[in-house]
């Protein structure tokens, strides 16, 4: 098996090292793990692609590349250039330092990398490690992902469904709870949730030279979540697994609007 890995925290992020270990275990002795990851942190870029300027790419070692672009750029660089003659069988994006559940999905570069792979027709999984007070005291805050990740990926590969009921390929979003590996209670297949109390804030800053800047600050990640959602599962020490597709259509409203607005 040939696996491509990327992330949004950057080529030197500890979560990418965790993902390399996970991918190596899944690929097996005869497999290959290729890394094409951002040269610099790209958190919060979602599914952005850098088509307005070229992307500098550097080979750092055998099957290891850094691109000055987003996770989606990295996936495209791998498919169109680095791995053009031998495309990946699976794309893994992560392991993100922090959860990508709930509304975080919409901002996540980690999810964006997996989504781009799905749009390119490849099986893809995004992996994120929820962080909190219990992971902060661990020598390896990614240990839940490191221990449980290979098993979940194998289960999804065995399940083998990468198509949806529409024209889009599925990809999967996995979030590991904010606890040590031994405290994980199991896995819950859950929908994307919503935390009503989470809001971004903008803080102004005036530089000594008179220029005015704005810092975008994230809200609390512990606000009450939609019951039985991905966030809810994580807060109860379960791994959440959410099947997703690159389609934002609200099909319920689509059907209703057709009856109201369409003529002829």
Curated annotation (Swiss-Prot):
Catalytic activity annotation: a ribonucleoside 5'-phosphate + H2O = a ribonucleoside + phosphate
Superkingdom classification of source: Bacteria
Keywords annotated in UniProt: Cytoplasm, Hydrolase, Metal-binding, Nucleotide-binding
An annotated GO cellular component: cytoplasm
Main location as per UniProt: cytoplasm
Pfam family, one: SurE
GO molecular function: 3'-nucleotidase activity; 5'-nucleotidase activity; exopolyphosphatase activity; metal ion binding; nucleotide binding
Subcellular location, record wording: Cytoplasm
Family: Belongs to the SurE nucleotidase family.
Name recorded for this polypeptide: 5'-nucleotidase SurE
Originating organism: Paracoccus denitrificans (strain Pd 1222)
Gene from which this protein is expressed: surE
């Amino acid at each position: 098996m040939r696996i491509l890995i990327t992330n949004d925290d950057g080529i030197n992020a500890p979560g990418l090292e965790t993902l390399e270990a996970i991918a190596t275990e899944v690929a097996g002795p005869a497999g290959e793990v290729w890394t094409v990851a951002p040269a610099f942190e790209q958190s919060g870029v979602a599914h952005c692609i850098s088509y307005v300027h070229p992307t500098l790419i550097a080979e750092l070692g055998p099957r290891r590349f850094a691109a000055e672009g987003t996770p989606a750029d990295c996936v495209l660089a791998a498919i169109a250039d680095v791995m053009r003659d031998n495309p990946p069988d699976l794309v893994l994006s992560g392991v993100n330092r922090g959860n990508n559940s709930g509304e975080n999905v919409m901002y996540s570069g980690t999810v964006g990398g997996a989504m781009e792979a799905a749009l390119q027709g490849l099986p893809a999984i995004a992996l994120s490690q929820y962080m909190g007070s219990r992971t902060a005291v661990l020598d390896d805050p990614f240990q839940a992902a490191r221990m449980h990740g290979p098993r979940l990926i194998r289960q999804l590969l065995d399940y083998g469904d990468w198509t949806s009921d529409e024209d889009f390929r599925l990809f999967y979003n996995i979030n590991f709870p904010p606890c040590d590996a031994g405290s994980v209670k199991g896995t819950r297949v859950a929908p994307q949730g919503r935390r009503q109390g989470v809001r971004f804030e903008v803080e102004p800053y005036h530089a000594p030279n008179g220029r005015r800047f704005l810092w975008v600050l994230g809200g609390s990640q512990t606000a009450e979540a939609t019951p039985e959602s991905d966030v809810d599962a994580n807060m109860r020490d379960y791994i959440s697994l959410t099947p997703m597709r690159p389609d934002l259509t609200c099909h319920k409203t689509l059907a209703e609007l057709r009856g109201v607005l369409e003529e002829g």
